[in-house]
Curated annotation (Swiss-Prot):
A motif (Nuclear localization signal 2) lies at residues 36-41. The lineage of its organism: Eukaryota, Metazoa, Chordata, Craniata, Vertebrata. The PAS 1 domain is essential for dimerization and also required for AHR:ARNT heterodimerization. This is Aryl hydrocarbon receptor. Its main location: cytoplasm. One of its GO terms (biological process) is negative regulation of DNA-templated transcription. The keyword Nucleus applies.
Amino acid sequence: MSSGANITYASRKRRKPVQKTVKPIPAEGIKSNPSKRHRDRLNTELDRLASLLPFPQDVINKLDKLSVLRLSVSYLRAKSFFDVALKSTPADRNGGQDQCRAQIRDWQDLQEGEFLLQALNGFVLVVTADALVFYASSTIQDYLGFQQSDVIHQSVYELIHTEDRAEFQRQLHWALNPDSAQGVDEAHGPPQAAVYYTPDQLPPENASFMERCFRCRLRCLLDNSSGFLAMNFQGRLKYLHGQNKKGKDGALLPPQLALFAIATPLQPPSILEIRTKNFIFRTKHKLDFTPIGCDAKGQLILGYTEVELCTRGSGYQFIHAADMLHCAESHIRMIKTGESGMTVFRLLAKHSRWRWVQSNARLIYRNGRPDYIIVTQRPLTDEEGREHLQKRSTSLPFMFATGEAVLYEISSPFSPIMDPLPIRTKSNTSRKDWAPQSTPSKDSFHPSSLMSALIQQDESIYLCPPSSPAPLDSHFLMGSVSKCGSWQDSFAAAGSEAALKHEQIGHAQDVNLALSGGPSELFPDNKNNDLYNIMRNLGIDFEDIRSMQNEEFFRTDSTAAGEVDFKDIDITDEILTYMQDSLNNSTLMNSACQQQPVTQHLSCMLQERLQLEQQQQLQQPPPQALEPQQQLCQMVCPQQDLGPKHTQINGTFASWNPTPPVSFNCPQQELKHYQLFSSLQGTAQEFPYKPEVDSVPYTQNFAPCNQPLLPEHSKSVQLDFPGRDFEPSLHPTTSNLDFVSCLQVPENQSHGINSQSAMVSPQAYYAGAMSMYQCQPGPQRTPVDQTQYSSEIPGSQAFLSKVQSRGIFNETYSSDLSSIGHAAQTTGHLHHLAEARPLPDITPGGFL
């Protein structure tokens, strides 16, 4: 601290000067010099007194004579205060056993106090009424950068910003009203307290208005922007006992008030700062960055002793080669401006370990000239260091790791060492890379140059065990991709699954071909490779690695171990269950073709047209002549579930070719939209639960009322129904069509057949195997196809009785419909087989 007129803020204390070398004793004897003997005795006593101070040895070695005296007085005053404040009982002082127990308890309290200081987000400060720092905890260094020995028994105003000194003086007064005559002299430091109060004039110590909470800015050596740190002071005024001060008349003064407070930063620290605040260390360097000192924390983090650190020469020997030019740039900036700014680089610790540090260097002046450099460094994690390395600016036309060729106009012979990556393998730095003829000698460079520091570094500090080879990693990545793709295989058909499997096998063969170059390609220079030696000791060959990379090997091994392969998981039932719970529609699919999606737009158009035609039908009711026809249809189809939706066919019916064509005189009936695909809404009917297969759009062409009943198709067999009774045929007829398979339903279900009379524009629906849905009754609807009922037709009665009895149509029928108005030219037989078979040769169009 300085009290000069031009210096108003605190600075670092001057240190003990370096002792001169002891001159040899002359042969003629020692001359008597009383003044020198007096100085020697004084220095001896000061050294003995300094050794008694409660400070680390590295701090004591740097104290000058005045600092030793100042700290000794401060320690004695603090001891006197605690002797009074923590006065023990006479029994404890007289009893030896109790005294031993008290010493153990005091030692435990001391250890607990150190832990409390480390956990506290701030430091403890005690300031007397005359603005002297009575005590400051050692943690003040973590926040302000000052040593504890630098601020004790010094004026507190030298630490406070000039604009906040008046407020701090007001807070020191018990009534917040200090004497105006005792102003703060900004040039010459703090005032001397001339007014002392007696206990009668002061309020009780436990009064509420003795509490203090205020803010002010303190001088901070760690701040890079303003040099001050805003802190919050929270505490109270308490009596400072045991000081034994005397007045001008020699009378003993009563204890005076002092501020006991905890100073905490206004901005709370981050988690990273909390973790690393106890590891900040400082080093001292010459102007050429040669280290000349290190504190105790630095020795603990780096592992060097102060002697090992100071006898190595240039400080650039401890810096990573890829960071040398980056640090040199900050070094030049510090020489020009006095401060380097925050610099992140890798520092070499003991046992060839690299530590990322964030440092800030300051230039210290003495007598107006630069004297030495103080560097404050904070350790970083490897992740933080890599982030700073990526953000590092590369404004120069070369990287910091390979810039020597530009600076020295020579080709760099140190390409393996100058790799900017911190991790290198031994295989990449063989002896053949270090040509003896290209390696310059140490004497060819200046001792203080970067190249000289680089040559003095050991090559082993840049070496580490090799990592796993890249081909194995790429194969594992491909294996994970194939496993993810196996989920899609469960939805594909058998043919596409085989093709995908063949493609995956092809990929595995490509990987094996890529790795078939031999061990030399996988592991270059494998004789010097640690991984190769370990594999040889374990009895593992490169052929074993190739077999492990084979996909079939992994699959066989996992199957033998009882593991479940993703491709063996069948989720079809789960998907069907989800669709059954979510939708009320059915899905009819054809087993011979692939599924074709139906868009939602088609569903909307069909629903709108259905609503329009329903309104037209309500406006035009059917005539009375159709009532028997409707009754017959209702009797034939007792449940709507057994309507045309249940009589779909795997294939097509044969074309009916009646002669002459008959036209039914009936009005156009309501157009029914049979939305048989699951994505179409509008039907509430469900069907018997059948296995799902692929489906195909099935188109049914309907004829108008004034046209023949069915169009002609040359590829189909004509089936004509005579107008007589339905009688079983004794002899099956031959046909080009093998069979016409109807939808198979359980035996307890009945079949409803509706003869279609009035047919309208063609409609598209899906024919095939039924969806696996449970049959539920739906809303009653008027059938599309209605046949006029006539009591004169005995065959109709027999057919109706069979339908109502819910029998199974497994036999062959021949029908005679001459009463309807046409004669049969060819008798057709309708076979209802037990199983449905696909008809690939028949066109997807037919009539029922």
